[in-house]
Curated annotation (Swiss-Prot):
Gene3D superfamilies: 3.40.50.880. InterPro entries: Anth_synth/Amidotransfase, Class_I_gatase-like, GATASE, TrpG/PapA_dom. This is Anthranilate synthase beta subunit 2, chloroplastic. Part of a heterotetrameric complex that catalyzes the two-step biosynthesis of anthranilate, an intermediate in the biosynthesis of L-tryptophan. In the first step, the glutamine-binding beta subunit of anthranilate synthase (AS) provides the glutamine amidotransferase activity which generates ammonia as a substrate that, along with chorismate, is used in the second step, catalyzed by the large alpha subunit of AS to produce anthranilate. GO terms for molecular function: anthranilate synthase activity. Residues 70-269 form the Glutamine amidotransferase type-1 domain. It comes from Oryza sativa subsp. japonica.
Amino acid sequence: MATAARLLPKIQSPASPAVAEARRRRPSSLRLGVTSGPARTLKQKLVAKSAVSVVEGENAFDGVKQDTRPIIVIDNYDSFTYNLCQYMGEVGANFEVYRNDDITVEEIKKISPRGILISPGPGTPQDSGISLQTVQDLGPSTPLFGVCMGLQCIGEAFGGKVVRSPYGVVHGKGSLVHYEEKLDGTLFSGLPNPFQAGRYHSLVIEKDSFPHDALEITAWTDDGLIMAARHRKYKHIQGVQFHPESIITTEGRLMVKNFIKIIEGYEALNCLP
């Protein structure tokens, strides 16, 4: 089992040039989740719009518990983040979005979110602002879903090593992903096996040094790359290497709905309101 001693030091390296450029390009008007001012109104409108779009369309709210406490989305300066938010809105989830350098872990803790979603993003886990520290400090007590960069943060937080993929960069590639059907309560409940997933990455969690004592591999590609993992003890910490929100991924909405169910299961187990 992983212990606190196994976690990596909370050291954030300076952003790489690619990450700095991505941050420079992002318009400041997308700052959501602040506590006052026009941006807060924008955040509220986005949440409402995401929820209303489903009320007028599909019945995606069915079976999903409504809760006023938000899911915190940590935006690692990635254009896919708001597609993930749209999926959460479609299943009736209340969420707030913060860039990875616009909020502290302590501030997130004070919000007491139902769950945390760590988005994709450029660079390595060291370029992800508070994302790595969030996994370390809040993951054990808060359901957490890491996507692409988010999974890599989970891997590093619990002793894994993030390396260049031996098969090079993939961008918008559809791959068959296989998952372990014997495991209950994963992001893949009810999905066909295998299913097609959209991949956009050059880094992976290294298989040879994978921290099997802390994490378990839950999905993989035909060539053996790790596509998903979860914590052995804190089973509410899960992540995927591919992009559920990509149009290439056939079952992305169901994975997001499964994350909400993981949150609900955690709340029931711990007698949370």
